[in-house]
Amino acid sequence: MAKYDSHLKCSFCNKSQDQVRKLIAGPGVYICDECVELCNEILDEELYDGNTPPAAAPAGGRRETPKKPSRSLPSLAQLPKPQEIMRYLDQYVIGQEKAKKVLSVAVYNHYKRLAAKANPGSVGVSELDEVELQKSNILIIGPTGSGKTLLAETLARMLDVPFAVADATTLTEAGYVGEDVENILLRLLQVADMDVEEAQRGIIYIDEIDKIARKSENPSITRDVSGEGVQQALLKMLEGTIANVPPQGGRKHPYQDCIQIDTSNILFICGGAFVGLEKVIEQRIGKKSMGFIKPGEQLSVSREQRMANALKALEPEDLIKYGMIPEFTGRLPVVATLDPLDEKALEAILTQPKNAILKQAQKLLRMDGVELEFEPAAIAAIAKEAYRRKTGARALRAIVEELMLDVMYEAPSRRDLKYIRITAEMVERRSTRELIPHPSTLPKPESA
């Protein structure tokens, strides 16, 4: 360190010694603390490859993660239109037409808002250019296995943006055992390879959001750290804030480096089954049958169908009565409701989507040289059993995996298996062993 002299200057930025905190002397040159810090940042940017963490920030300070080149936001002309989004969703999601239309419009408007922020003045009308477009997050309500998560991840795949899924049941208010809400952002950041700019244009799906409803309609004297407390913690994140995210996850503490993420451009989609919400709606309108079914038919209507009928009359006040605080409900203005899946819908899910479960099984066996075919009656039997289990489309894969176990086990080692036909009887027995002859029953090759 050189002795104090107001005439000494940094050889790089030309600032005098009284303009900087430190001035380091070398053989005929001087460098200030600000230029040293700048050099460190330049080295970090050049050496950082996305996997090796950047150099630690000085004690008490924060250093932003060096940014890799990010894809720019698409222009308004490049954005897929709602009808294009709808057609893409149709390839992967069966039914749920109203929900797909709601999501298509909401997602299009969200990324149109981002395009407007990136290109101010794009409207061309001066009084409209000054209008600020607010973010509209989405709430999806539907029974288990109806396609809530599938819709969200399909949207993210089409738009080619980072997508992360979080479970609301693991979250607690800051200071209590459990995950901080900022860990949701860390998952998105990890999917984006720690690229902050890329993560800030992504989509986060928060599942089981109904599980953080407060325990009673009236505010409680005791702390509700996994219910109302989590809703309060999520408010700013949903609305848009600069959040400090610990890069290693876990709880934050004052002496660790944090990555700052702006959530104002992140689209949040929350989903939940909201079991019992139909009772709240029916109580509000004062009708037990809801007017959607004839008198005397109530006993024949399933709980899922009763829920679907009730959701047609859903109002924000019903969600508040259920246990969502008014501020939280207000930050999810777009609501999409999903219908329960009947047997016909489950049959379609087995065969029609691009990545249908039966198509996946056929592809796996074709790789072993085996052609697989399902009789229509077998498909109907699988759908019937899945409907009986009351877990929606999730049951389909479990049934098919159980049914195909023996075939998948034998096929890679057997050259005599060229064609397999699955019947309804096999589905009912959950076994395909009769299709596979035991090696001892095959004719022995003639000796030379």
From Swiss-Prot:
Residues given in the record as Zn(2+) binding sites: C10, C13, C32, C35
Span list, region Disordered: 50-76
GO molecular function per UniProt: ATP binding; ATP hydrolysis activity; ATP-dependent protein folding chaperone; protein dimerization activity; unfolded protein binding; zinc ion binding
Alphabetical UniProt keywords: ATP-binding, Chaperone, Metal-binding, Nucleotide-binding, Zinc
GO CC list: HslUV protease complex
One of the GO biological process terms: proteolysis involved in protein catabolic process
Keyword ATP-binding: yes
Top-level taxon of the source organism: Bacteria
Positions bound to ATP: P143, T144, G145, S146, G147, K148, T149, L150
Presence of keyword Magnesium: no
The ClpX-type ZB domain, residue ranges: 1-51
Family recorded in the similarity comment: Belongs to the ClpX chaperone family.
Described function: ATP-dependent specificity component of the Clp protease. It directs the protease to specific substrates. Can perform chaperone functions in the absence of ClpP.
Subunit description: Component of the ClpX-ClpP complex. Forms a hexameric ring that, in the presence of ATP, binds to fourteen ClpP subunits assembled into a disk-like structure with a central cavity, resembling the structure of eukaryotic proteasomes.
Name under which the protein is recorded: ATP-dependent Clp protease ATP-binding subunit ClpX
Organism: Synechococcus sp. (strain JA-2-3B'a(2-13))
